[in-house]
Each structure stands twice: as structure tokens, then as C-alpha cells.
UniProtKB/Swiss-Prot annotation:
PANTHER family: LARGE RIBOSOMAL SUBUNIT PROTEIN BL27M, RIBOSOMAL PROTEIN L27. Residues 1-10 have a biased composition (Polar residues). The N-terminus is cleaved by ribosomal processing cysteine protease Prp. The keyword Ribosomal protein applies. GO terms for molecular function: structural constituent of ribosome. It comes from Streptococcus equi subsp. zooepidemicus (strain H70). Disulfide bonds: none annotated. Pfam families: Ribosomal_L27. This is Large ribosomal subunit protein bL27.
Length: 97
């Protein structure tokens, strides 16, 4: 009869090691989108819409910044409008005094 020596048994892992990954990060949100609502009164220089590219085009009294941000050139009321069949624009109409 063979006698087993239990103190010499090796225990192997039943799960693989965790390893590492190159994922697990995310960039901060850029806070893009509308900053003024339709019908809202804004002052000159106010940011109306932050975007990457031209999702919305500048209309009357609206300028476009270097990063495609749309801003009001004059004080007035914001209007989001259609420009043709498939484009949108934002305009600022001065308040009549």
C-alpha cells in the first residue's frame, strides 16, 4: 500500500490572473448643445449654441466662432429656424423699442 504525503501537494489556481487592460478611461464631457432657448432674450456676445462642425448655421445677427460656436451679435430674441429642407439656423431679432 502506497502512503500519500499530503504536505507536498501543490495547489494550482482555479482562476487566471487578473492581468491588465488598456481600457478603463473616458474623456470629460464637452458641454455641447443649446445654451439659449427659442424665444429667450439674450444680450450681444451671448453664446447661443456650442457645437463641433456646423449642425446649426448662423442666421440673422448671429456670428460663428473659430470652434463653430454660435453667438449673438446684438441684443434680442432667439429664434431657431429651418434653413431649406434639411438645415437649421439660429437668428437673433432685435426687440422693437
Amino acid at each position: 500500500m502506497v502512503k500519500l504525503n499530503l504536505s507536498n501537494l501543490q495547489h494550482f489556481a482555479h482562476k487566471k490572473g487578473g492581468g491588465s487592460t488598456s481600457n478603463g478611461r473616458d474623456s470629460q464631457a464637452k458641454r455641447l448643445g443649446a445654451k439659449a432657448a427659442d424665444g429667450q432674450t439674450v444680450s450681444g456676445g451671448s453664446i447661443l449654441y456650442r457645437q463641433r462642425g456646423t449642425h446649426i448655421y448662423p442666421g440673422v445677427n448671429v456670428g460663428r466662432g473659430g470652434d463653430d460656436t454660435l453667438f449673438a451679435k446684438v441684443e434680442g430674441v432667439v429664434r431657431f429656424e429651418r434653413k431649406g429642407r434639411d438645415k437649421k439656423q439660429v437668428s437673433v431679432y432685435p426687440i422693437a423699442k
